[in-house]
Amino acid sequence: MEKIQRYLQLERSQQHDFLYPLIFQEYIYAFADDRTFSRXXSILSGNPDSENLGSRKKYSLLIVKRLITRMYQQNHFLISSNDSNQNKNPFWGRNKDFYSQILAEGFAFIVEIPFSLQLLSSLGGKKKRVVNSQNLRSIHSIFPFLEDNFSHLHFVLDILIPHPVHVEILIQTLRYRVKDVSSLHLLRFLLNEYCNCNSIITTKKAGSSFSKRNQRLFLFLYNSHVCEYESVFGFLRNQSFHLRSASSGALLERIYFYGKVERLVNAFDKVKDYQVNLWLVKEPSMHYVRYQRKSILASKGTSHFMNKWKCYLITFWQWHFALWFHPRRISRNQLANYFLEFVGYLSNIRTNPTVVRSQSLQNXFLINNAIKKFETLVPIIPLISSLAKAKFCNVLGHPTSKPVWADLSDSNIIYRFVHICRNLSHYYSGSSKKKSLYRIKYILRLSCARTLARKHKSTVRVFLKTLGSGLLEEFLISEEDVLCWTFPKTSSALRGVYKSRIWYLDIICINDLANLK
């Protein structure tokens, strides 16, 4: 980001008001194509694995120059996408999908510049310290917070964050942060070209096509919407409930990435004794956590208190965002009797009774203690369904071969299975009970063996007898390497590793099989 800031040589104030002229600069598309600034595969890079409508064109300045020339010649953006002759729009020509996606990638990169510059300026002297703590850039950083705080809470609201139904809702939300009117008109044009309808997220076909073609722009729009939705908690913290003031900023996931290090979890702790005009305000402690499309709001208050919060959130969404939100998308549950589906885990708070024998002089007595423990379990049924969908097993969990990979080399087949097994193993390494995780590993190992046996036209038993323990070692080595990296100095920490929970804080993204949503 600093390199871009020096290259553009623009003041922060100008970044907010004059973003649109940058869309005509060639270097913007070069920056957008750079993988350093984009995690998703770009259509400009010609990645063979990306779905780009069959067009695997390499990045070329000539293509960008043609696009810029077309934008300079006429203002074709005035043509409505709802026009019956939209397919004959002379601006796109024959390469409508390709040109529109290039323009969308460039726009997504440009519109992130003000937010990124604001983040760098807010970090200031803390920048180096934040960057050095790269191991904390993980969704697993949320579990220590849950273990320390959720054990004494009573009720939780499990919330599915509502999506905007209309394109104009996204545009209006972004108007509070981007003041360049021309850029907003360009965004409206791109959304209409992508979807040709008023709904870009709720419609399955349109939303799926939009998110797959340009994930970066989709994430930016969605995070802007969520940021506006979460602003209500900051208002309530400072106004209604007299919550303790804490420094917090508008965090956009995957855009304000390093900001998640210090403010990954927004915990709003109540001030226990707050005296105003000789009357005492005592409110239950509230904790708010968000991950992707879900968020949870937990409290140690009563059931009636949580119902009031539920009604308030529904009313807020309907009046502020002008969208209908079904009450069933918010479920109120008691933590002691409810499994919370969060971050791919099934979490629950259980009471474990313990008996302690004490002796004072000649008298011995027993003390019964009830300790609340935060447990995280592997969702075995959704995982097996994901493996069955990927053709690694059937719906009952019996391993099958992968015929599509049978034409690959042996090393490539083993690498692919090990890679998936390693990602799933690392992601669910924090589970309290690892029996379900061992079953997933067994399915992948046997599926790998059956795929290799199918390739060599042999049986699994004969193939494993010929190969020996080599296949098993491939799966185990991947785990040992990570364990050594996690504990580089204390080898004794490896003892009892399968009995305790280990959080792999170096995980940023996981395999699609581990993403149950």
Swiss-Prot record:
Question: In the UniProt record, which is one GO cellular component term?
Answer: chloroplast
Q: Where are the transmembrane segments?
A: none
GO molecular function (one): RNA binding
The listed locations are:
Plastid, Chloroplast
GO BP terms, alphabetized: mRNA processing; RNA splicing; tRNA processing
**Which Pfam families did the record assign?**
Intron_maturas2 (PF01348), MatK_N (PF01824)
Q: Taxonomically, which superkingdom?
A: Eukaryota
* Major subcellular site: plastid
Swiss-Prot/TrEMBL keywords: Chloroplast, mRNA processing, Plastid, RNA-binding, tRNA processing
Q: What function does this protein fulfil?
A: Usually encoded in the trnK tRNA gene intron. Probably assists in splicing its own and other chloroplast group II introns.
The record's comment on protein family reads: Belongs to the intron maturase 2 family. MatK subfamily.
Per its record, how is this protein called by name?
Maturase K
Q: Which organism is it from?
A: Veronica arvensis
